[in-house]
């Protein structure tokens, strides 16, 4: 009798766990890196609306190498200081950037666009294919605070890859390790 109860409890637990997992995947809930709407506070506020919007600074100026590399780098403080060595130097936030720069201490920015460990995303190939950064990242030039706009789920990516005009590969190894 006890074995039957234990067996039933295990079966119910497994069924419940699988059900929750499937529900979360199909509803784009925060699971294995799909964080649509994620908008973390950063150690130093940075306005893409000001920099990319008002000043029209191209994404590739700060995110150097994004057109040649698999990854879009978080800008080094050197990039910030190219302008802020003379611009808004009296701002308390710029003073923190400057202090970190001269102390050779990188700022611990919070990563916004998270992908599962088993997924690889090559920024360079997407840029070479003519995809604008806004396709995946949204209209950052209108964002005071950066957030993840798209789900970045497998289904979302595959929908784009399946568009005939994109001529994008559909084999699993393109995106998965």
Named regions from a protein language model:
Residues 100-102:
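General zinc-binding finger modules coordinated by cysteine/histidine
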Residues 8-25:
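Hydrophobic membrane-insertion alpha-helices, especially the h-region
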Residues 104-127:
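Alpha-helix-centered segments that form part of catalytic cores
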Residues 22-40:
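Aromatic-capped interface at the extracytoplasmic side
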Residues 41-93, 119-177:
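Sequence context surrounding c-type heme c attachment/ligation sites in exported
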Residues 1-6:
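Positively charged n-region of N-terminal signal peptides that target proteins for export
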């Amino acid at each position: 009798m006890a074995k039957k109860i234990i067996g039933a409890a295990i079966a119910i637990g497994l069924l419940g766990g699988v059900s929750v997992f499937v529900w979360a995947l199909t509803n784009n809930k925060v699971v294995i890196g799909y964080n649509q709407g994620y908008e973390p506070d950063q150690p130093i506020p940075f306005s893409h609306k000001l920099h990319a919007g008002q000043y029209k600074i191209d994404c590739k100026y700060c995110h150097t190498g994004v057109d040649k590399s698999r990854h879009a780098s978080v800008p080094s403080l050197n990039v910030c200081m190219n302008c802020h060595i003379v611009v808004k130097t009296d701002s308390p936030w710029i003073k923190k950037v400057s202090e970190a720069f001269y102390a050779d201490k990188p700022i611990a920015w919070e990563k916004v666009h998270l992908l599962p460990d088993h997924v690889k995303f090559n920024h360079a190939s997407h840029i070479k294919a003519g995809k604008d950064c806004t396709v995946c990242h949204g209209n950052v030039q209108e964002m005071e605070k950066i957030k993840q706009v798209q789900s970045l789920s497998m289904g979302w990516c595959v929908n784009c890859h399946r568009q005939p005009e994109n001529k994008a590969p559909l084999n699993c190894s393109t995106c998965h390790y």
